């Protein structure tokens, strides 16, 4: 399968990521889900967690972002992820990512 889908992670301050991908996984309010090219259109609320973008290999995430929750719009050709915060954690260890996630969740709970 050589098809790709355009994925954008958008924050109020910038476009954190804009790439063609073979697959994207993320945390919805009802659990983790993945999106492939030609996916049925949908709009989904996202929880704070990881967005994993698979560029060349569908078995290894090549770009990983920690987001503060938000909303995603999916069509057959693109995925737009709107979030307040997007942190590139691609090169961090699992322990560092877990620490950043806990920090982000604490910040979000302090705001509410």
From Swiss-Prot:
Keyword check for Ion transport: yes
GO-annotated cellular components: plasma membrane; proton-transporting ATP synthase complex
InterPro entries assigned to the protein according to its UniProt record, in alphabetical order: ATP_synth_F1_dsu/esu, ATP_synth_F1_dsu/esu_N, ATPsynth_dsu/esu_N
Domain of life: Bacteria
GO MF terms, alphabetically ordered: ATP binding; proton-transporting ATP synthase activity, rotational mechanism
Presence of the UniProt keyword Cell inner membrane in the record: yes
UniProt keywords, alphabetically: ATP synthesis, Cell inner membrane, Cell membrane, CF(1), Hydrogen ion transport, Ion transport, Membrane, Transport
Annotated Pfam families: ATP-synt_DE_N
Subcellular location(s) of the protein: Cell inner membrane
Known function: Produces ATP from ADP in the presence of a proton gradient across the membrane.
PANTHER family referenced in this protein's UniProt entry, alphabetically: ATP SYNTHASE DELTA/EPSILON CHAIN, ATP SYNTHASE EPSILON CHAIN, CHLOROPLASTIC
Quaternary assembly: F-type ATPases have 2 components, CF(1) - the catalytic core - and CF(0) - the membrane proton channel. CF(1) has five subunits: alpha(3), beta(3), gamma(1), delta(1), epsilon(1). CF(0) has three main subunits: a, b and c.
Protein name: ATP synthase epsilon chain
Organism, scientific name: Rickettsia conorii (strain ATCC VR-613 / Malish 7)
Gene: atpC
């Amino acid at each position: 399968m050589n098809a790709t889908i355009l994925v954008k992670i958008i924050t109020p301050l910038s476009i954190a990521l804009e790439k063609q991908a073979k697959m994207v996984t993320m945390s919805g309010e009802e659990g983790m889900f993945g999106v492939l090219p030609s996916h049925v259109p949908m709009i989904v609320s996202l929880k704070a967690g990881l967005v994993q973008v698979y560029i060349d290999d569908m078995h290894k995430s090549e770009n990983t972002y920690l987001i503060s929750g938000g909303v995603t719009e999916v069509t057959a050709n693109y995925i737009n992820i709107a979030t307040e915060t997007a942190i590139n954690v691609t090169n961090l260890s699992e322990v560092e990512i877990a620490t950043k996630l806990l920090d982000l969740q604490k910040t979000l709970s302090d705001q509410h």
